[in-house]
A protein has these predicted regions:
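C-terminal subregions of glycosyltransferases and related glycan-biosynthesis enzymes
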Residues: 139-140, 145-146, 152, 172-230
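Nucleotide-sugar donor-binding/catalytic module of glycosyltransferases
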Residues: 1-186
Length: 230
C-alpha cells in the first residue's frame, strides 16, 4: 500500500502489479501511518482472497528464508482453527550488509501470558502468520485507534485464541536508520515502543480500546484481567 507518498512509489507498485498480477496487488491512499496501512491491506486481503487459509504481515526491508512461510504453516496445521491463531518467531538481527548481529530474543525470557501481553509483545509483525479466523476477527472488531497493528493481533490471539512462538529464526531483520520505528537495533526499537510510544498512560489507553473492541468476545476472566490494566 502506498501511504500517500509524493515520489514515484506508486508508479513502482503499479509496475510490479502489472508484471506479477497473480501474486502482487497494490492499494493507493492517503497518509494514515503504518498501523492503519497494514490494517487496510488486511481488510482488502480478507475480502478479495476469500479462499485463503493464512495471511502474513511483511516489511519491505527484511530478508525471508526460503522456508519461512512453510515453517509457520507446518506449526499451525495441527492447531484448532476454530479460534484465532498467530505464529511468530525469533528474528536474526543483521546490519545493512546482512552481517549477523545476534538473535533478537532469548527464548528463556519469552513469556507468553495474558498478563504480559497487556504490556509487551514478543511477536514481531514481519514474522507473523495467522489463520483466517484471526484475520476476520481483526478486521471486524477494530478499535477506534490502532497504534501498532502487530501488537493488536498479538493481544487478539493471546486472549481469544493462541500464540505459537518459534524460537528459531526464519528472517533477517535488517537494522538501519530508515527502519520505520527508527532505532538502530531491535531492542532499542522495542524499548522505544515501551518507554516512549507506549508509556504507562498510553498502554492503559491501548488496553482500554482493546477491551472496548473485543468485550463481546472475551471471557469474564479476561475482561476482569484487562480491566486491571486500564
Amino acid at each position: 500500500r502506498d501511504d500517500g507518498s509524493s515520489d514515484s512509489t506508486w508508479d513502482l507498485l503499479i509496475a510490479y502489479k502489472e508484471r506479477y498480477p497473480m501474486v502482487f496487488d497494490a492499494l493507493e491512499g492517503e497518509n494514515v501511518g503504518f498501523a492503519m496501512s497494514f490494517t487496510r491491506l488486511l481488510q482488502r486481503a480478507v475480502e478479495r482472497y476469500n479462499d485463503a487459509d493464512y495471511f502474513a504481515f511483511c516489511d519491505q526491508d527484511d530478508v525471508w528464508m526460503p522456508d519461512k512461510l512453510k515453517a509457520a504453516v507446518d506449526r499451525l496445521k495441527g492447531e484448532d482453527h476454530s479460534i484465532p491463531l498467530v505464529y511468530c518467531s525469533n528474528t536474526t538481527l543483521v546490519d545493512v550488509n546482512l552481517r549477523v548481529i545476534r538473535e533478537a530474543w532469548d527464548p528463556r525470557r519469552v513469556a507468553l501470558t495474558k498478563e504480559r501481553a497487556l504490556i509487551q509483545s514478543f511477536a514481531t509483525g514481519c514474522t507473523m502468520v495467522f489463520n483466517r479466523v484471526a484475520a476476520e476477527t481483526y478486521v471486524t472488531h477494530l478499535p477506534e485507534v490502532i497504534k501498532v497493528h502487530d501488537f493488536l493481533m498479538y493481544q487478539l490471539c493471546m486472549f481469544l485464541g493462541k500464540v505459537v512462538w518459534d524460537e528459531k529464526s526464519y528472517i533477517l531483520y535488517r537494522q538501519h536508520g530508515n527502519n520505520q520505528i527508527g532505532k538502530k537495533d531491535f531492542m532499542g526499537r522495542m524499548r522505544k515502543r515501551m518507554e516512549g510510544h507506549y508509556k504507562e498512560h498510553v498502554l492503559e489507553l491501548q488496553n482500554r480500546r482493546f477491551l472496548a473492541a473485543y468485550k463481546d468476545l472475551l471471557s469474564e476472566e479476561a475482561v476482569w484481567l484487562i480491566s486491571r490494566f486500564v
